[in-house]
């Protein structure tokens, strides 16, 4: 059993929009033999679209909107990739994905360096001590000086770095990378093929000069000396603790430097790690199955109105058609057709091990954070909802389709696309999101998947705070006094909707015994 778990590698690829995350995912799948031709992302000349972007709206805009799950075998390893959306409006989905992975690859654009989105996501990795590998992409275009990039990575992401490959120039002068880890030179030919020319070179001989010319050879030698002098030696323990990040350079679109990244990754990345539950720590090699739902997706197949709950197996072995306990409902369920994914294509699986991600058919029984076990009462920690940044009233634009609209809103909220609050004062539904793009996605999906039309009406709100108090009388007084600001979330918890920072401050000062929370995880 342990051998099966040991060979699992489950990781997420995160980055700022357009740093080349989906291109990197495609190339990894190409090496895993999962796709024959990578769909050149967003190019209009080639009418293929990326494998991991499967929703209509993703294909139209050339961006990733939801996390895709893909798995393949590489050498002796079983690899599960989660490709996450980088657009900040979909950050909620990404935060939750990070709870289901054992390590992370961060993609950084060589010309732009570290951007805001990457910083935010890195904070979540730090909270969980997730091991990180950094891939500096687009070296075939003009890029910043590699030493400046390393300084920026250390400063912005608060982590020590150690380059394991090193670029020779960038842009039109880009010659390739030197693989410090294996002491080989990889020469660059711009093409979309899987082959790169690898040469074993002793860098202290003239062999190097013959390949890249004397001036560049001299420069490379002095840079490598500097790297050894300045950066800490690469120790796997430091990487696994989340204290040191190895750095690779390359060009995902031209498929260059990707194989080095993958080969090193499967060697050093952690197999499934223990997961914290409220009751205890769950180890992956325990004999009994446990797992939690970290994401729900409606309509992977547009012909059937079906939902799929993505479940991360935390320990033991999941077997098809075996009864498992759904802890929140306290009822036993069996799954006759659990699936594994290649973005939209899915295949039925008979068994899955710790570290795997399986899709369970869902007709409304699952919520994000639900736990499945063989009978034990367990609750896994840490799938927070953050207080939304933007709010709008959602109104029905076609009274004949009320039922479809309500069903659509329910399913989309189960997915965690946005949050729904019901105003206690007037009973109207308020949708809260992390960004403007989500409103468009909700409207588009309601119309195209549920045949329901909605319209948005503005509402001026500053923050949604979940409230609680040890003094029930004070809580009641607060709710009566602030009646026009009170709402309920989908779980029926009390939420205070402040329409300005001043209103929130005054409420906090007037009611000292009430706790105001900005995430739903408390």
Give a label for each model feature.
Residues 1-522:
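Structural and coupling elements of P-loop NTPases
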């Amino acid at each position: 059993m342990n051998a099966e778990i040991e060979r699992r590698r489950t990781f997420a690829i995160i980055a700022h929009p357009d740093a080349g995350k989906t291109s990197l995912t495609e190339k990894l799948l190409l090496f895993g033999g999962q796709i024959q031709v990578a769909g050149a992302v967003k190019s209009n000349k080639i009418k293929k679209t990326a494998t991991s972007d499967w929703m209509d709206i993703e294909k139209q805009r050339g961006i990733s909107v939801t996390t895709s799950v893909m798995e393949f075998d590489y050498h002796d390893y079983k690899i599960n990739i989660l490709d996450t959306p980088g657009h900040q409006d979909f950050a909620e989905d990404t935060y939750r994905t990070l709870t289901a992975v054992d390590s992370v690859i961060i993609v950084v654009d060589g010309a732009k360096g570290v951007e805001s989105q990457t910083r935010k996501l890195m904070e979540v990795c730090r909270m969980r001590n997730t091991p990180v590998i950094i891939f500096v992409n687009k070296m075939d275009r003009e890029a910043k000086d590699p030493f400046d990039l390393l300084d920026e990575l250390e400063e912005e992401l608060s982590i020590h770095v150690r380059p394991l490959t090193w670029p020779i120039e960038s842009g039109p002068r880009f010659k390739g990378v030197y693989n410090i880890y294996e002491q080989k030179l990889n020469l660059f030919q711009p093409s979309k093929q899987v082959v790169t020319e690898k040469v074993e070179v002793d860098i202290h001989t003239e062999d190097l000069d013959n390949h890249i010319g004397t001036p560049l050879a001299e420069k490379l030698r002095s840079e490598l000396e500097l790297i050894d002098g300045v950066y800490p030696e690469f120790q796997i323990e430091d990487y696994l603790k989340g204290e040191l990040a190895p750095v690779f350079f390359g060009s995902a679109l031209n498929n260059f430097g990707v194989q080095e990244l993958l080969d090193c990754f499967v060697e050093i990345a952690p197999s499934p790690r223990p997961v914290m539950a409220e009751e205890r720590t769950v180890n992956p090699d325990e004999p009994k199955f446990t797992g939690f739902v970290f994401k729900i997706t409606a309509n992977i197949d547009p012909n059937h109105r079906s939902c799929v709950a993505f479940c991360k197996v935390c320990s033991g072995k999941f077997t098809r058609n075996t009864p498992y306990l759904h802890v929140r409902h306290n009822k036993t369920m069996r799954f006759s057709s659990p699936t594994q994914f290649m973005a939209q294509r899915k295949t039925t699986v008979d068994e899955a091990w710790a570290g795997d991600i399986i899709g369970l058919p869902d007709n409304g029984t699952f919520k994000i954070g639900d736990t499945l076990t063989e009978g034990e009462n367990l609750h896994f920690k840490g799938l927070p909802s953050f207080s939304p940044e933007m709010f709008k009233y959602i109104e029905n634009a076609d009274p004949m389709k009320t039922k479809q609209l309500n069903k659509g809103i329910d399913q989309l909220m189960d997915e965690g696309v946005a949050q729904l609050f019901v105003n206690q004062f007037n009973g109207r539904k308020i949708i809260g999101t992390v960004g403007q793009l989500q409103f468009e996605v909700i409207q588009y999906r309601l119309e195209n998947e549920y045949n329901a039309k909605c319209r948005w009406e503005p509402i001026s709100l500053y923050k949604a705070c979940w409230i609680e108090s040890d003094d029930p009388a004070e809580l009641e007084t607060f709710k009566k006094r602030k009646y026009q600001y009170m709402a309920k979330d989908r779980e029926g918890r009390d939420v205070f909707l402040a329409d300005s920072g001043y209103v929130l401050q005054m409420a906090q000062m007037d009611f000292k015994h009430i706790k105001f929370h900005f995430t739903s995880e408390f």
